[in-house]
Amino acid sequence: MKFRLRFTSEARKKLEELSKQDPKKNKKVLKTLGLMETNLRHPGLKTHKYDSLEGPNGEEVFEAYVENRTPGAFRVFWCYGPNEKEITILAITPHP
């Protein structure tokens, strides 16, 4: 299933920062976002529910891997919605 990505202002700001400050990491994030648009079950994403957060309206939040086995490995936190076939990128951040 193909999804349209929406970004919170926090996530968009982080993506813009990465494009200027760390192009290599930005490229990895863009690859992850591309996979999320087309296949949330891609094995490289290791997508799973993240119980410590809730979406803006109480939605379940999920985590997708940008990197693995790397100090400060980046993750993308997201939730379904607000509309059908959309996911909202809540944060792009190093693993908490």
Regions found by a protein language model. Name each.
Residues 1-73, 80-96:
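Basic, Lys/Arg-enriched alpha-helical interface segments
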